[in-house]
Amino acid sequence: MMNETRTTIDQDEIDRFSRIAAEWWNPKGKFRPLHQLNPTRLAYIREKICLAFNRDPVSLMPFENLKILDIGCGGGLLCEPMARLGAMVVGVDAAQTNIEVAKLHATQSDLSIDYRTTIAEALADKGEKFDIILNMEVVEHVADVNLFIAATAKMLKSQGVMFVSTLNRTWKAWGLAIVGAEYILRWLPKGTHDYKKFLKPQELKNLLSKNALTVIDEIGITYNPVNDSWNRSKDMDVNYLLLAKRP
């Protein structure tokens, strides 16, 4: 049964994203940074999944027969490209409004994606297993990160991989992701991020290791203001992504 006293839900976070749900598919709207970031993270995800599962990276549908979970899927910005690459995709989000937007857009795009309004621990209790879990820009928004990582790790099949991206707890991240992005450039609504919820890479690695997952790759993702683009980097001071595998 789902734990009655502990939950990953942060209702304030859910309410905040619910208020701007209609913006998900507007590339110039409140989720503009995610639209800009998407090509970089998609290229990395595709490359690493093909390596992990010995798939042809130039194939039109290299993810065929792979089951992917996108946890905290929002409006489906990652679910849709995963489905186009042939995967069986389950997208979950705690905000009903996000799921409604995602379902509508998938229908308009003629894509079959299993969208559900639920939370990590409730889904884990059902015993479903996935080849790949996308845990992208979510851990900094949950109420109990230990419970969240435990629940998501529980759903990963043997030899499966999980991508986890978040923000580092550094003054540089505070200055760029909060002061810069929310208050100066106003890319994101004020209050989108809580610095106390940022995790240092080693802290996240420890949580993954505690749940029998081994980190096999790590990258930083940095913003280049000159050409207004996001790129892979060795600099993990702000945005970073870990790739973990279950033996």
From Swiss-Prot:
One of its GO terms (biological process) is methylation. It catalyses: a 3-demethylubiquinol + S-adenosyl-L-methionine = a ubiquinol + S-adenosyl-L-homocysteine + H(+); a 3-(all-trans-polyprenyl)benzene-1,2-diol + S-adenosyl-L-methionine = a 2-methoxy-6-(all-trans-polyprenyl)phenol + S-adenosyl-L-homocysteine + H(+). CDD domains: AdoMet_MTases. It holds the Pfam family Methyltransf_23. The lineage of its organism: Bacteria, Pseudomonadati, Pseudomonadota, Alphaproteobacteria, Hyphomicrobiales. Pathway: Cofactor biosynthesis; ubiquinone biosynthesis. This is Ubiquinone biosynthesis O-methyltransferase. NCBIfam families: UbiG. The gene is ubiG. Its EC number is 2.1.1.222, 2.1.1.64.
